[in-house]
């Protein structure tokens, strides 16, 4: 169904069964598949292809040659009706690719809201990207990667499958991330190693001086105390009782499966 207030360019192809919301704009030479839902106010500039069982929220801007919901690159994929879900107010720039999930990985590739995905960024099957994240030009996420809120991944950076990028992390450009990056950390290199706390990012987002100090103390326990992670976990949990921002570390530890960058 195409809402009567939506615009569809005469050269665009919107297949029967697709849903186009109010005030959406489907530009020249776009292709929208039969199981696609485009939310209110979302703009497909031109030459955008949206396939598969894909749901896109409202007020997104999707630029030319982006491909969303296409068949993933997992050799086990056998055509199952897996999905892509994208939230609201994202800017998805030229030639970005976002692939549908796999049955083995839960069947869903998910992108939240208010993200900036720069030119040629790639989000593989079963990835989860939170809110207000930035993937710079040519940043690539392998399958099953999680990127938490406010994370920034630099240009030409590759993230290994199943890795977790914590909230407020900054990964420098041209890096290779092979293990999990704890929240608030700056990481750089191939393989990526920690370079301290993303202090400037936390200041910009309104973290108090006391909270930043507590986060830095947790970082020092993890990386500079000479203790094992199991040894410092109780100390970080105790610190989190006073400073709730530190709880992001304890929650992260519970999710981590690949070990932390070192």
Curated annotation (Swiss-Prot):
It comes from the Bacteria. It is an enzyme of class 2 (transferase). Substrate binds at residues 73-76, 125, 144, 161. InterPro entries: Acetyltransf_C, Acetyltransf_C_sf, Hexapep, Hexapep_transf_CS, Lipid_A_LpxA, Trimer_LpxA-like_sf. One of its GO terms (cellular component) is membrane. Its EC number is 2.3.1.129. Coiled coil: none annotated. Keywords: Acyltransferase, Cytoplasm, Lipid A biosynthesis, Lipid biosynthesis, Lipid metabolism, Repeat, Transferase. It catalyses: a (3R)-hydroxyacyl-[ACP] + UDP-N-acetyl-alpha-D-glucosamine = a UDP-3-O-[(3R)-3-hydroxyacyl]-N-acetyl-alpha-D-glucosamine + holo-[ACP]. GO terms for molecular function: acyl-[acyl-carrier-protein]-UDP-N-acetylglucosamine O-acyltransferase activity; identical protein binding. Disulfide bonds: none annotated. SUPFAM superfamilies: Trimeric LpxA-like enzymes. Pathway: Glycolipid biosynthesis; lipid IV(A) biosynthesis; lipid IV(A) from (3R)-3-hydroxytetradecanoyl-[acyl-carrier-protein] and UDP-N-acetyl-alpha-D-glucosamine: step 1/6. It is found in: Cytoplasm. GO terms for biological process: lipid A biosynthetic process. Pfam families: Acetyltransf_11, Hexapep. Belongs to the transferase hexapeptide repeat family. LpxA subfamily. NCBIfam families: lipid_A_lpxA, PRK05289.1. PANTHER family: ACYL-[ACYL-CARRIER-PROTEIN]--UDP-N-ACETYLGLUCOSAMINE O-ACYLTRANSFERASE, ACYL-[ACYL-CARRIER-PROTEIN]--UDP-N-ACETYLGLUCOSAMINE O-ACYLTRANSFERASE, MITOCHONDRIAL-RELATED. Involved in the biosynthesis of lipid A, a phosphorylated glycolipid that anchors the lipopolysaccharide to the outer membrane of the cell. Homotrimer. This is Acyl-[acyl-carrier-protein]--UDP-N-acetylglucosamine O-acyltransferase. It comes from Escherichia coli (strain K12). The gene is lpxA.
């Amino acid at each position: 169904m195409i809402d009567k207030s939506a615009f569809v360019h005469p050269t665009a192809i919107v297949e029967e069964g697709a849903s186009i919301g109010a005030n959406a704009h489907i530009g020249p030479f776009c292709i929208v598949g039969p199981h696609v839902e485009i939310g209110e106010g979302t703009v497909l500039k031109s030459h955008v292809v949206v396939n598969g069982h894909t749901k896109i929220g409202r007020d997104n801007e999707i630029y030319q040659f982006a491909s969303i919901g296409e068949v993933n690159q997992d050799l086990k994929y056998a055509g199952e009706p897996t999905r892509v879900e994208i939230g609201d107010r994202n800017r998805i720039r030229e030639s970005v690719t976002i692939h549908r999930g796999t049955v083995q990985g839960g069947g869903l590739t998910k992108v939240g809201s208010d993200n900036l995905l720069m030119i040629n960024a790639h989000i593989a099957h079963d990835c989860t990207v939170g809110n207000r994240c930035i993937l710079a030009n040519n940043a690539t996420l392998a399958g099953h990667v999680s990127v938490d809120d406010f994370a920034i991944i630099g240009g030409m950076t590759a993230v290994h499958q199943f890795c977790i990028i914590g909230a407020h992390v900054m990964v420098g450009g041209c890096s290779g991330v092979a293990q999990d990056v704890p929240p608030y950390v700056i990481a750089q290199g191939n393989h990526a190693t920690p370079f301290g706390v993303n202090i400037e990012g936390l200041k910009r987002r309104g973290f108090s001086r006391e909270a930043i100090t507590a986060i830095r103390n947790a970082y020092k326990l993890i990386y500079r105390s000479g203790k094992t992670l199991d040894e410092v976990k109780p100390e970080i949990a105790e610190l989190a009782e006073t400073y709730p921002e530190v709880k992001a570390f304890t929650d992260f530890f519970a999710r981590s499966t690949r070990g932390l960058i070192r």
